[in-house]
């Protein structure tokens, strides 16, 4: 019995956030013209997962006592880059995905190098680099438009078995591959401490 109470006390913040989410989603679907349908849930999942990816990236930085104001601009840059590179055949799309992920990694490495070796405050560095990343994104896509490989887009925004939003499965995969190992590693435990 004590184990259950301990777990409940330890997770009360997460459970409260989940409860608030359920209440807000219920209000959202009750006010939506289509009501609570599979399409409404799928659309909300697709939009929410994008925000969750950005939030996870920012959380890793904040846990290590930093701040990165360029995360949104890196997300924007990689989206614009994806609209140029993640097209064509399966192999071309795969190379495009690797290039886009590599670009995000490079942007983060640039931020880290400037903070560490340039000895600048993270907030100043990431505001400046965010402006640069935004400028590059505008050079790539001065006007809204572009697309990515339709098969990949359908696979990541569709429904599995006609019910489960694929974007939620992608989010779960990222959590299992990135977040869980980080939180259980020596580095992750040290960051939380």
State each model region's role.
Residues 70, 94-95, 121-124, 186-192:
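Residues that define the loop-to-transmembrane-helix transition and helix capping
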Residues 25-29, 36-89, 114-120:
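Single transmembrane alpha-helix segments in multi-pass membrane proteins
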Residues 21, 25, 76-80, 104, ...:
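Residue-level recognition of pore/gate-forming positions within transmembrane alpha-helices
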Residues 5-9, 122-185:
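Transmembrane helix-bundle core of multi-pass membrane transporters
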Residues 1-19:
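Transmembrane alpha-helical segments of polytopic membrane transport and secretion proteins
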Residues 90-130:
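Alpha-helical transmembrane segments within multi-pass membrane transporters and channels
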Residues 20-36, 64, 137-142, 178-188:
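Structural signal for alpha-helical transmembrane segments and their membrane-water exit/capping regions
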Residues 14-19, 44, 52, 73-77, ...:
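Hydrophobic alpha-helical transmembrane segments
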């Amino acid at each position: 019995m004590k184990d259950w109470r301990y777990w409940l006390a330890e997770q009360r913040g997460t459970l409260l956030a989940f409860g608030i989410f359920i209440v807000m989603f219920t209000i959202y679907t009750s006010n939506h013209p289509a009501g609570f349908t599979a399409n409404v849930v799928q659309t909300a999942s697709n939009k929410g997962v994008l925000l969750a990816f950005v939030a996870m990236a920012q959380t890793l930085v904040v846990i290590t006592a930093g701040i990165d104001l360029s995360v949104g601009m890196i997300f924007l840059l990689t989206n614009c880059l994806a609209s140029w590179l993640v097209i064509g055949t399966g192999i071309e799309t795969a190379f495009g995905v690797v290039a886009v992920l590599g670009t995000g990694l490079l942007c983060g490495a640039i931020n880290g190098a400037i903070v560490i070796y340039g000895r600048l405050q993270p907030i100043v560095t990431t505001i400046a680099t965010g402006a640069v990343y935004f400028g590059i994104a505008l050079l790539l896509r001065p006007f809204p438009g572009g697309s990515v490989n339709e098969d990949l887009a359908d696979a990541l925004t569709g429904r599995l078995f006609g019910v489960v939003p694929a974007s939620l499965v992608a989010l779960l995969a990222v959590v299992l591959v990135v977040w869980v190992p980080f939180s259980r590693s020596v580095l992750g435990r040290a960051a939380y401490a």
